[in-house]
Amino acid sequence: MSVISTKLVTSPKQATSSNQTTSTKQVIQTWRTELKTQQNVLEATFLANKNTQQLLKNHTTLIDKLLQKIWLQANIDGAVCLLAVGGYGRGELFPYSDIDLLILLPSQHDYVLNQQVEALIGLLWDIGLNVGHSVRTQEECIGEASSDVTVQTNLLESRLLAGSKTHYLQFIKAMDALMQPIAFFVAKFKEQDNRHAKFNDTAYSLEPNIKESPGGLRDLHMILWLAGSQKLGKNWVELAKNNIITDAELRQIKRHERNLQTLRIRLHYLAKRCEDRLLFDFQNELAIDLGYETTHRKRASEQLMQSYYRSVKYISLINEILLKTLEFTLSKIAPIIVHINARFEARNSLLSAKTARTLQHYPSAILECFLLLQQHPELTGMSASLLRELQRVKKLVNRDFRDSAENKALFLKILSEKNGVNHSLRRMNNYGILGQYIPAFCKIVGQMQHDLFHVYTVDEHILNVLANLRRFAKPELKHEFPLCSQLFAAFEKPHLLYIAAIFHDIAKGRGGDHSSLGTVDAKRFCKLHGLPKNDTHLVAWLVEAHLKMSSTAQKMDLSDPAVIEQFAQFVKTERRLTALYLLTVADIRGTSPAVWNAWKARLLESLFYATKRVLNDETFSVQQTITLRQQKAAEKLAKYGLQAKSYQALWDNVGTAYFVRFESDEIAWQSRLLTPHVYADKPIVRARLSPSGDGIQVMIYTRDQDDLFARICNFFDRMAYSIVQAKIYTTINDYALNSFTILDQSGKSVSYSGLLRFIEAELSEKILATTPIETPLSGRVSRQVKHMPFATQVNLRAEASTNRHTLELITADRPGLLAKVAFIFLQLNIDLHNAKINTLGNRAEDGFLISAKNNHLLNPAQIDALSAHLNLL
């Protein structure tokens, strides 16, 4: 039964018959109120019965009847047509979508008609309709459609709402004559490519667009437009009747289309606007509305998004299959067939099976077809028939299939090929084969990670890591990462790195330590595939340790020889070091475009080289490191005409520990600047562009004071600079010698020479100031942080040998975070001895070495107060 009331279609004339003095404004308000009432009824009905198709149909009918009544009362020339076009013409009117209309004028029309049409459009807006309209003659429509495929597409789905049926049929006939299916196909295919490129060719972003993203509703519309242009059907049922899609595909398409339509409807109602992006603001509420519940393993929103990603994955697949099918139907030329082997051939550069049951009869051919694409670069992909056959037989990839020696050899061969490894595995994932072959992989397909720094699903991230490893193998890309390319070229058995990449995050979402759980899966895989013990041990170790190098580089003091020695003892061999370095770089770069930067690259490279030196030098010692750094610094200082006697006083005052904390380049730079100022009365602040090529390095030398760190952090925070490294050091003569590396957060273009002078002058003034420190700024947190709460973790460990505590703070990053932490230290009378700042996207993982005053351990009351303050950040 329709929920549409007959009240809404009462005409203005009827509404005013009982009272001739009713104003036009009152009539408009009446119509507006009735429209809103009926739209509210539609919303309530949908939320009660959750019938997506009924909502779209009834909303379309509601607007149809309203427009028809208004048109009738407007008394417009009978030769004029009112047409529904676009999504409205298709009969899919979402709650807050534009109502796309075409007012089709006769070739000859006068000023009066133009005025009537203009008044009509104004009335539609006045009563609350979001109208997207065009007013054209038939000739103008043809001209626009000839030059703009978007206009032509919009008119494909036109419906006559009111006006001359004869005129409309003439218009349809003219538009049909204009259609050139081949040209239309080429234009739409290019349009889809461009649209996908706007979303970085991935459907798996954190906040996808339900309508426009790859795998979204627009990819389904694309199929219907192209089929319609060839007169093969205007809807899915017609396509099935015309054998363009199978009955099984019909059911799957309808299921996944309905899933996205339901999400889009609910999103409109939640946002109370035409919002097609699955923003963080709505994901939690949408998930709850749809009945998802948070578990100890997955948030409700993660389950919602996994359902969404699996739908868009299927839609992307069926889009590929049907576009190839429709392209084939357009071809008037016999295909060029090239023999490949007994099972496969190339048809117009697409891999095809020689018989319809090839994969059924020879299951190993399921993997073979991916291998052939690697071995035959002239092939551009798989034919529609082969893709369909893959979907039909993929359940054959079962335990018996995985136990087959032939199939195991084929999979290892895919990983060992020189070309196409990334493309093959990505295709295997897109077509549902990779998850069948590696069951653990199936569980993480479409699984989002709300950890504030991964911006892709787990499966997409894994494939990104693999793609990054493959980039190291390409000589034409060696300029991107010269060291990685050099190491990769010399690394035997690179397929071991690919296996480690596949398994490094495969246990995400299971609960527990994903590295340990993934190691079990990796060992099982290696054993099943007959890898030698040494190779198996390497892969398993890489999966278990894949976070270690990143954590060490970003959280530990790499200038401390003890840190390097400890890491060297952990990796044990240069082969392991090389493998872990390559995997780590690929992993970090695969998490998010925002996470990787030159600073992180320099940290990892420094750790690699330092560890390699230790592994190759059995006589390594801390004293050896100190001596070497002093020698290198002295060589640099000699180039400036400085002899040892000139800076010896400075070196005596900084103490031996200084040469452990700072690298030779920093020692030389600081010595050159501070030699005349060993007992300076005023702060010495010097800034330079970081030698790593990313950020600014700032040195502060001044008499130590309790609020020094807080003042410095506050200053950089108000400059909108983020601190990526802080080295805090106190000399024997009680001077603070601190070094900060900062990065610009604003992205503004600046004059660096002026900026460096500004920092030197203004920071000196801030340090000398006797006024209280300004309260840290409360910057706006990102929407992701706001809507995906991340519990702050405070880990405090006593170092009894040094009377200090190691503090690890893991929390959502935000502007002013470090300034607030410094302010807390000041309030609680806590001394800071070192800081390691690590930002991963929207997540901060910072480390601090702290103590109470006079170098004592914190007492229980201070520990409780510190934890309480930090948890309130």
Language model segments and positions:
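Non-catalytic interface/linker regions that flank or bridge core catalytic/transmembrane domains
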Residues: M1-K13, S17-A84, G91-L93, I99-H454, ...
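Regulatory modules associated with amino-acid/nitrogen control
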Residues: N259-T262, E285, Y292, R299-L351, ...
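Hydrophobic alpha-helical scaffolding
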Residues: D110, A174-F185, L206, I210-G215, ...
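Divalent metal-dependent catalytic cores for phosphoryl transfer on phosphate-bearing substrates
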Residues: G91-Q116, K241, I253, T457, ...
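Short, conserved secondary-structure transition motifs
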Residues: R136-S147, L542-S551, I742
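Long, K/E/R/D-enriched contiguous segments that form extended
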Residues: F401-A500, G509-S515, V520-K527, H537, ...
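Conserved catalytic alpha/beta cores of large enzymes that bind or transform nucleotide phosphates
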Residues: L129-G132, I142-G143, V397-K408, R470, ...
